[in-house]
Amino acid sequence: DLKLIGMQFIIEGLALAAFNTAKAVTPDPVLKDILHLIIRDEARHVTFGVNYLEDFIENLSDEEKEDRAMFAYEACVISKERLFPTDVFRKFGWDEDEAREFSNNAGFASEFQRLLFSRVVPNLSRIGLLTDKVRPLYDKLGVLEFESHDPDGDISWAELEKPLDLSA
């Protein structure tokens, strides 16, 4: 189950954020269509994890749930921090906090984080991994606001199976 949490939620969430970012900025219509198909496929992977883990997590002890909740939180912290090349900041003698703030205010990092955590956080909430113990940590991380977004477990399989609409 830790592999599913890591892969189906965090890694696939990173992939979805990356592909959605690329789709939003590319002027190439063919690449946009290809990215649309990739995003649909990645969404299926996330949905599988949500649907499976929702039932699995329900049957764990409170201690086991907390372990998984902390694992997911730590993975989110790592995912958020990977957007900032702090080793580069240090190499050039830049203040890490100032460089991180500048990078965040430049737009790309904050938009990528929004795309990532607007998928990951509601999914973690749906499967019961936003526990009372980790909820304040997510709040401090600045991503708890995404809890009310739609989780991926409700994705329409019929919609995902439709062929690409080329008229748009």
Spell out what each predicted region is:
Residues 1-7, 36-38, 104-106:
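A ubiquitous short alpha-helical element
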Residues 18-19, 26, 47-48, 120, ...:
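Aromatic-enriched hydrophobic runs in primary sequence
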Residues 20-37, 51-67, 94-102:
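Inter-helical turn/loop segments and adjacent helix faces that build the functional surface
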Residues 8-16, 32-49:
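Alpha-helical membrane segments in multi-pass integral membrane proteins
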Residues 1-25, 79-84, 96:
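Alpha-helical bundle segments that constitute or directly flank the non-heme di-iron/ferroxidase center
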Residues 45, 49-54, 114-117:
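Charged/polar, low-hydrophobicity segments characteristic of intrinsically disordered regions
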Residues 62-168:
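Extended, helix-rich structural scaffolds rather than catalytic motifs
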